[in-house]
Amino acid sequence: VGALSVLLDMEYEIFEELISEQFASKKNLIEPNLKALNIGRDYVLNNLPYPIGLTLERMEKNDGKILISGNEAAGLGAVYGGATICAWYPITPSTSLAEGFEKYAKKFRVDEKTGKNLYASVQAEDELSAIGMAIGANWNGARSFTATSGPGISLMSEFLGLAYFAEVPVVVFDVQRGGPSTGMPTKTQQSDILACAYASHGDTKHVMLLPEDPKECFEFSAMAFDLADRLQTPVFVVTDLDMGMNDWVVDELEWDDSRKFDRGKVLDFEALEKMEEKFGRYHDVDGDGICSVSYTHLTLPTSRSV
């Protein structure tokens, strides 16, 4: 440590302070550690060229910063985005995203009067069941999602094609890992881009959001549910193991409490009554490629912020 303090041109006084703090309860260890620190420092000063071109400066830039992983941020973003259903199957490195959603749903998705859960987190028997549950919940009016990794995307592809052509919104989090097939669950890679963009056979082209840090994981997670409802299609939030499982230092997460959910072209009873022609689920009245949908028999999630 003493040698590195010189090679990296670090403030020597910092190490003296840290040693004194570390061994404050064991005063007899302070002097030997300071002596060892000085031995390393003096050796470099007398025998090696220094500094080596790299410099570590005192970091005093933590104001307004938090420490959070991409998966936890995305799970929180799903709660703020109005998600009430998470259907998932355990797979590294996405499992902690589903667990993060459940953690925050227990705080924000419980009825204060009755104590009843206003959410469901379902660990399915496999990836096919997970995506099927997520699509079914969205078809029934809920905001639902699943979280998986590359092997799961392969297994979910046919269901994703169904959601695409039936125009059913669903959000899929793909926390990428390394290699084809089972691959390397504990290694990071960004190799699912095309697999997500064109998931399923046939003419499918999916919406993808690619955050660059956990702060954007939170923001893009909430955004994904609005996009899925507005466009009536699957939306992918694609991250990787490094971002998903590791804690990053990022700016504090921000949320506009006046923000409302965008449920897209949803017709209620009043809107249906005013229609001059018969409602058609796949009738493109506006000519923008997005048809109206009726959830009149359902209870929609509230539009107020959590």
Residue map of PLM features:
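Short alpha-helices
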Residues: V1-E21
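Structural signature of the thiamine diphosphate
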Residues: M10, L34-N46, H206-D262
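Conserved small/polar residues in nucleotide/adenosyl-binding loops
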Residues: T296-T302
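Acidic, proline/serine/threonine- and glycine-rich low-complexity intrinsically disordered segments
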Residues: S292-S294
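Short, well-ordered, mixed-charge alpha-helical segments that flank or form enzyme active sites
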Residues: L7-D9, K27, T95-S96, G179-S181, ...
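Active-site loops and adjacent core secondary-structure elements that bind or stabilize anionic groups
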Residues: M245, V249, D256-R263, D268-G289
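Thiamine diphosphate
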Residues: I14-A199, K205-H206, P211
